[in-house]
Amino acid sequence: MIKKKTYKPGSATIAQNKRARHEYFIEEEFEAGVVLQGWEVKALRAGKVNISDSYVLLKKGEAFLLGATITPLNVASTHTVCESMRTRKLLLKQREIDSLFGRINREGYTVVALSMYWKNAWSKIKIAVAKGKKTHDKRDSIKDRDWKINKDRIMKNANR
């Protein structure tokens, strides 16, 4: 009997958008499936994906991922056209799409991709409703992060 492949928590991550948490206030997160072609799945398994400039566009009651780059492998088939920046459809429930549509109609809100990961054998993407940060907000978050690191360092040394 074939044993199911189990991933450790955190090891199933394919790609992360670290810039998103720096440039946006994250309001609410959603999990969505991604419609992929065969060569794209192979490239994801090899880790050849970049979602740092990606965002979600809602059109006619459907959600699409734009700006994600999946680089084709050298051994990709020659009879298929490998377009690395193509628009990919996201699989969400209609209730979730309606919620996203209602939220992004507000001023300053957008939907960005946070991370892409494997869930069992399916490729999933974590998307979030986000509001853009101003420059002083970015500086404040950097100061808070640095203070937290210093505080942890001080507490670690104080306990010795």
Swiss-Prot record:
Alphabetical list of CDD domains matching this protein: SmpB
GO cellular component: cytosol
Highest taxon in the source lineage: Bacteria
Keyword Membrane carried by entry: no
Provenance organism: Hamiltonella defensa subsp. Acyrthosiphon pisum (strain 5AT)
Any Gene Ontology biological process: trans-translation
Role: Required for rescue of stalled ribosomes mediated by trans-translation. Binds to transfer-messenger RNA (tmRNA), required for stable association of tmRNA with ribosomes. tmRNA and SmpB together mimic tRNA shape, replacing the anticodon stem-loop with SmpB. tmRNA is encoded by the ssrA gene; the 2 termini fold to resemble tRNA(Ala) and it encodes a 'tag peptide', a short internal open reading frame. During trans-translation Ala-aminoacylated tmRNA acts like a tRNA, entering the A-site of stalled ribosomes, displacing the stalled mRNA.
Location in or out of the cell: Cytoplasm
One Pfam short name: SmpB
InterPro entries for this protein: SmpB (IPR023620), SsrA-bd_prot (IPR000037), SsrA-bd_prot_CS (IPR020081)
Entry's Gene Ontology molecular function annotations: RNA binding
Gene3D superfamilies: 2.40.280.10
Keywords: Cytoplasm, RNA-binding
Gene that encodes the chain: smpB
Official protein name in the record: SsrA-binding protein
Family membership noted in the UniProt record: Belongs to the SmpB family.
